[in-house]
Amino acid sequence: AGIEPFLNIWHWTVPTWFSDKDGFAKKENILYFERFVAKMCHELQIKELRYIITLNEPNVYTSFGYITGEWPPQQKNVLTAMLVYKNLVIAHKRSYKILKEANSHLQIGVAAQLGNIQAKRPHHIFDQTVTKLMRYGWNWWFLNRIRRYQDFVGFNYYFTDYYKGFSRKNPTIPVNDLGWYMEPEGVY
């Protein structure tokens, strides 16, 4: 009925054994993900698919798992977060190559959570600078590194964040069930 399926390979699920090996924090562990993608190519009928998402929201996984520590593996280490983010870039690129070799017609990309990041004080130079850095790190750093290894970008938008310096200073309403400030106009 006009519905086109998208296969999402990785949506933050990390097996315990992979986590015990430090998951995506170790570059050598990317090989396990590559094997998973290759096995999936052989076991699924990917010839009938057109779209594959290799990674869902790598920025969200990295920040909540390795910066805020709110989600597994519940670490608070910016350096580890940077390694994880970099290794997810490598994992995507390698997966892209494996999938294209298996079926060159596939359209492959990531689902990116892109936030509307704004300065709380629009004319304050420090807030503007921080906002530009945050926007780049959250929205564009990953996508810029995979630009030659993607056929599309899945766009997920959930919130607007306002920054005063390095502190998030969002209005208190309206918020969703996760406590995220909602601003539908931010998608424009």
Task: Identify the role of each PLM range.
Residues 1-188:
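Non-catalytic scaffold segments within catalytic domains of secreted glycoside hydrolases
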